[in-house]
From Swiss-Prot:
It is an enzyme of class 6 (ligase). It catalyses: tRNA(Lys) + L-lysine + ATP = L-lysyl-tRNA(Lys) + AMP + diphosphate. The lineage of its organism: Bacteria, Pseudomonadati, Pseudomonadota, Betaproteobacteria, Burkholderiales. Signal peptide: none annotated. This is Lysine--tRNA ligase.
Length: 515
């Protein structure tokens, strides 16, 4: 059987190409059947001694004379990405988890039977080799193969090497193929792992204990969001996938664990957008005897170090614009940000709830009769105007501080500004990256705020919070002054990897069903 041509291996985009792919798959199934009959279809007795990346790192500058004088024996395996058959000698480019390396395969070295079989192996097959390192006449570090085996037969052809997966949705839906053919995708997810590892080190060095709290909650809480609902059969009770771990983490502060953090999934039954995925990763941390000012300094340093560890520099480029994370982050109030980016608004207008309600309705076409606006006060209206006029302009790292109490039901109130809380949100490239505040530890104040949230929910606001009586009971045992913050890991990784869509940094994002 002949080797599939590059055109045959392309991603099918027409009926004709689909037929070609089906033909290729049928041919490969015939090859697999022959391997089964020989009893060698999927061997599992090969142990590699090296990876491609490590070989290039260690021997990338070693010349041929040195390799001949001190032979380097290697056993290596990977996916065959390129293949050139030339009479009695052939080349194959093999890719493992660390990179690519070239195999040099000759009939004299591997034997006539193996060499004949190799000619019928396909791109995408997993193969292994034992041999010695050498340099080709062109100077490329390669493996002079002595033993060659087929470990796993690929039945489906890879996309064309020059075009890869052209359709973005296919990249998300078939991430396994995207990872095979796209070095950029592999780099993105390695950077994600490095960023999370950096965060864990940073937290451990600061004395934080990593914990795990429930994913199934009897009462959803810790954020203003619509939950996913499920049913616990054994307990015969309705449960909610967690929207945030906040209230459980603060219970641990009450219990005496004074510095805790968790990196885990949250679930919110809401829309999908370039910034939102219903299942996403958050890091939340809480520290006793701190406040929101301490949190801002700590978060700034943590993000800066994550950039250095994941990308090698505190300076990153996002969508063609450079960001220097080594500089101090800006700080603005909500009204200060509005007047910076929409200077036409006066102090008097920003203090006039009737004006703001009319402005949001008439200029920004917002339905101010919606349930979440029924009892909206000045603070809520200011926040919505900020979101419409300023949020997208916050490209440089900027803390927006001093949020209204009515939109911050879990945050401690300011000692000097009535109606304001000690809360911040961090924006970078116009996106919220973090949200933190000095925690409200007054159980009576917290209970009253929960009651107001219940009123909002009863009025039709699906994102308003429930009343959590057990959390109030925990606060009644006494919680020390505490600061807490949540950081969106996915959005942070978007920033560090120059990814425009949150689905670019989630291995298997949610998509509509295939027809």
């Amino acid at each position: 059987m002949t080797e599939p041509t590059r055109a045959q291996a392309a991603t099918p985009t027409t009926e004709g190409l689909a037929v070609d792919e089906n033909k290729i798959i049928a041919e490969r199934r015939e090859k697999l059947q022959a391997l089964r009959q020989q009893g060698v279809a999927f061997p599992n007795d090969f142990q590699p001694t090296h990876q491609a990346g490590a070989l290039h790192a260690q021997y990338g500058e070693t010349d041929q004379a040195t390799l001949e004088a001190s032979p380097v024996e290697v056993s290596i395996a990977g996916r065959m990405m390129l293949k050139r058959v030339m009479g009695k000698a052939s080349f194959a480019t093999v890719q493992d988890g660390s990179g690519q390396i070239q195999f040099y395969i000759t009939r004299d070295k591997v034997g006539e039977d193996v060499y004949a079989a190799f000619k019928h192996w396909d791109l995408g097959d997993i193969i292994s080799a034992r041999g010695e390192l050498f340099r080709t006449n062109k100077g490329e570090l390669s493996v002079q193969v002595r033993e060659l085996r087929l470990l796993s037969k690929a039945l489906r052809p890879l996309p064309d090497k020059f075009h890869g997966l052209a359709d973005q949705e296919t990249k998300y839906r078939q991430r396994y193929v995207d990872l095979i053919v796209s070095p950029e995708t592999r780099s993105t997810f390695r950077a994600r792992t490095q960023a999370i590892s950096s965060i864990r080190r940073h937290m451990a060095d600061a004395g934080f204990m990593e914990v795990e709290t429930p994913m199934l909650h009897p009462i959803p809480g810790g954020a203003a969001a619509k939950p996913f609902i499920t049913h616990h059969n054994a307990l015969d009770m309705q449960m909610f996938m967690r929207i945030a771990p906040e209230l459980y983490l603060k219970r641990l502060i009450v219990g005496g664990f004074e510095r805790v953090f968790e990196i885990n999934r949250n679930f919110r039954n809401e829309g999908v957008s370039p910034r939102h995925n219903p299942e996403f990763t958050m890091m939340e941390f809480y520290a006793a005897y701190t406040d929101y000012r301490w949190l801002m300094d700590f978060t700034e340093n943590l993000i800066r170090q994550a950039a250095i560890d994941a990308r090698g520099s505190a300076t990153v480029t996002y969508q063609g614009r450079e960001l220097d994370l080594s500089k101090p982050f800006h700080r603005l109030t909500i009204c200060g940000a509005i007047q910076k980016y929409a200077p036409e608004y006066t102090d008097a207008q920003l203090a006039d709830a009737d004006f703001l309600r009319a402005e949001l309705k008439n200029k920004f076409k917002i339905n101010t009769s919606a349930p979440q606006f029924l009892n909206a006060g000045l603070g809520t209206l200011q926040l919505v105007l900020f979101e419409e006029t300023a949020e997208a302009q916050l490209w440089e790292p900027t803390y927006i501080v001093d949020y209204p109490v009515e939109v911050s039901p879990l945050a401690r109130g300011s000692d000097t500004q009535p109606g304001i809380t000690e809360r911040f949100e961090l924006f970078i490239t116009g996106r919220e990256i973090a949200n933190g505040f000095s925690e409200l530890n007054d159980p009576e104040d917290q209970a009253e705020r929960f009651r107001k949230q219940v009123e909002q929910k009863d009025a039709g606001d699906e994102e308003a919070m429930y009343f959590d009586a057990d959390y109030i009971r925990a606060l009644e045992y006494g919680m020390p002054p505490t600061g807490g913050c949540g950081i969106g890991i996915d959005r942070l990784v978007m920033l560090l990897t120059d990814s425009p869509n949150i689905r670019d940094v989630i291995l298997f994002p949610h998509l509509r069903r295939e027809d």
